[in-house]
């Protein structure tokens, strides 16, 4: 019984191609997994940008608090309801 080599070579090549396709679509490092990781990276970049902007705002606020008393005075008036000596506070009811 003699094996026809082109037939077996064809079968081996088809099996190798099927194995590679399986890894491409389903296995570790598949296209779906790469797409999910790219989405996670994009989401993380967005979150990082949001946090960087928040940090810039907080840094500016801290610098303003360190440099002047205007901001401290404004926060004391609005958040704590404080008034200066000699001032009278009038609250209007709605």
UniProtKB/Swiss-Prot annotation:
All ranges on the Cytoplasmic side of the membrane: 1-8
Coiled-coil residue spans: 31-78
Record-level GO cellular component terms: cell division site; cell septum; plasma membrane
Keyword presence, Amino-acid biosynthesis: no
Transmembrane intervals: 9-26
Compartment(s) of residence: Cell inner membrane
GO biological process: FtsZ-dependent cytokinesis
A Pfam family recorded for this sequence: DivIC
Main location: membrane
Membrane-side (Periplasmic) residue stretches: 27-94
Presence of the UniProt keyword Manganese in the record: no
Swiss-Prot/TrEMBL keywords: Cell cycle, Cell division, Cell inner membrane, Cell membrane, Coiled coil, Membrane, Transmembrane, Transmembrane helix
UniProt membrane topology term: Single-pass type II membrane protein
Membership in a protein family: Belongs to the FtsB family.
Assembly description: Part of a complex composed of FtsB, FtsL and FtsQ.
Cited function: Essential cell division protein. May link together the upstream cell division proteins, which are predominantly cytoplasmic, with the downstream cell division proteins, which are predominantly periplasmic.
Name this polypeptide is given: Cell division protein FtsB
């Amino acid at each position: 019984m003699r094996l026809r080599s082109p037939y077996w070579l064809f079968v081996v090549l088809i099996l190798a191609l099927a194995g590679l396709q399986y890894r491409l679509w389903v296995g570790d490092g598949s296209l779906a997994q790469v797409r999910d990781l790219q989405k996670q990276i994009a989401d993380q970049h967005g979150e990082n940008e949001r946090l960087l902007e928040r940090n810039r705002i907080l840094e500016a606020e801290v610098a303003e608090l360190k440099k002047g008393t205007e901001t401290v005075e404004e926060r004391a008036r609005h958040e704590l309801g404080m008034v200066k000596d000699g001032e009278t506070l009038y609250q209007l009811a709605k």
